């Protein structure tokens, strides 16, 4: 009668990054991050891990808004961060009006919720971690990125 649900956990703004960074460090093939905003401060914290992943040959894909969609200093911060991401070998995709906040790791684990992974600063947020290759691949197809990332 009831289907077995994939394993999931909930995090807030205080607990998310510890779990996320642990999953990043265990990545073996690919990390996809969707974050509409990219801020200097958060990038400084995540960049060492992303750089380490890139050196290990792990594909990094970031889907975000184009910097021109941001106002004021946010556009400059996004543009500079995008250049830095590209310099470490990340693929950066742009989606107009983008507002999804999620990450997919090795197509086996994903996070989804309200926290902007590449720009979070000080708001009250929630993120759900789901460990399911079936659901991770389903999410990737649903958001339309499969055609850009291909098989792993």
Model segments located where?
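A conditional alpha-helix N-cap/helix-loop micro-motif detector
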Residues: 12-13, 43, 92
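Generic domain-boundary/flexible-linker signal
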Residues: 42, 71-73, 113, 121, ...
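Primarily the HKD phosphodiesterase
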Residues: 23-86
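Acidic/glycine-enriched edge-of-secondary-structure segments
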Residues: 1-14, 32-38
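A short, polar/proline- and glycine-enriched secondary-structure boundary/capping micro-motif
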Residues: 44, 73-74, 121-125, 148-152
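HKD (HxKxxxxD) catalytic microenvironment of the phospholipase D
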Residues: 31, 90-136
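Cysteine/selenocysteine-centered motifs that mediate thiol-based redox chemistry or coordinate metal-sulfur cofactors
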Residues: 137-152
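Short acidic active-site motifs
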Residues: 19
């Amino acid at each position: 009668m009831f289907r077995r649900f994939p394993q999931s956990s909930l995090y807030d703004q205080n607990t998310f990054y510890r779990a996320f960074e642990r999953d990043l460090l265990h990545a073996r093939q690919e990390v996809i991050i969707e974050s509409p905003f990219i801020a200097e401060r958060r990038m400084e914290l995540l960049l060492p891990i992303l750089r380490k992943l890139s050196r290990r040959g792990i594909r990094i894909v970031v889907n975000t808004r184009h910097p021109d969609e941001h106002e004021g200093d946010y556009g400059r911060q996004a543009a500079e961060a995008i250049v830095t991401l590209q310099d470490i070998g990340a693929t950066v995709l742009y989606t107009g009006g983008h507002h999804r906040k999620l990450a997919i790791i090795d197509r086996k684990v994903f996070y989804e919720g309200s926290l902007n992974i590449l720009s979070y600063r000080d708001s009250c947020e929630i993120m759900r971690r789901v460990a399911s290759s079936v659901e991770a691949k389903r999410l990737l197809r649903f958001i339309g990125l499969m055609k850009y990332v291909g098989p792993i």
